[in-house]
């Protein structure tokens, strides 16, 4: 079983923004040394205490700081971006580090309504649906679009290209990924529904047995009940439920108030705690083993929901696949 890290680059306790970004880099180096397969960074906008706004910038930097680990976006929020330009960016990055670049793509806005309005201000009103934009991006990456002979994202799209992943949390998105033969990352740390995880994993693998199905989970090493309690207290979750059925999850009261102030929509707010896998190394591995035996998961991705730098490091060290042997891959970086 392969293990991966998702780092949302939070502002850490007692750290400046620059120091927190430094920790994002150091954690990538640590994961690289310890045999993790992938290290993903996210895209968020106008979010309190979250730094990562530009995964393409961080991915390029982290590839330069590591040797073996795959580095990727987890993910590019495609509703804010031109699919052709995203394909160009990650094709270029892939030329810098062949075989190590992953492009995860998500549908969520990754930020507040104000940020979404700012990011999409100049986009045409009849913006394509997410599925259309994703298929457009895939066609550029795969060189299968209608104008592929004259419109290219690079002078060379054969020697190296990014591995493409769809990020999602529903049966429909998993089926969409499988139908289009794209790897899939299920955001279990958002959905927190094991029955749904099993249903989605089984459906995806049935439709696309050759695809990678990755379950992204919230995981923290906690040795005592006191540490477990502290982790739970740090991770309150607010679900914003919109009239049209949409649900958005945020982690602070300020974010809740910002959403309410910046929209005319009626919103129902529900407070709960983030569902996490907490415990000792053996307890966490036992739970992961239970999940992998109950549904066809290819890899796990660990989201570390804490602003405590030491706890983040300890969790990554404790769960390290240190017996995995990696051959260093060639590249310019």
Name the predicted role of every residue range.
Residues 3-7, 39-41, 71-73, 101-105, ...:
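Hydrophobic faces of well-ordered beta-strands that scaffold small-molecule active sites
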Residues 1-66, 330-332:
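N-terminal beta1-alpha1-beta2 module of alpha/beta enzyme domains
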Residues 3, 31, 43, 62, ...:
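Conserved, mostly hydrophobic/aromatic
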Residues 2-17, 80-144:
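Flexible, glycine-rich active-site loops centered on histidine and acidic residues
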Residues 172-190:
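A conserved active-site cap/scaffold subdomain adjacent to cofactor or substrate pockets
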Residues 32, 59-67, 94-101, 144, ...:
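Acidic (Asp/Glu)-rich catalytic clusters
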Residues 124-151, 195-295, 327:
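An alpha-helical appendage that flanks or caps ligand/catalytic pockets
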Residues 7-21, 76-83, 158-168, 272-281:
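Active-site mouth loops of central-metabolism enzymes
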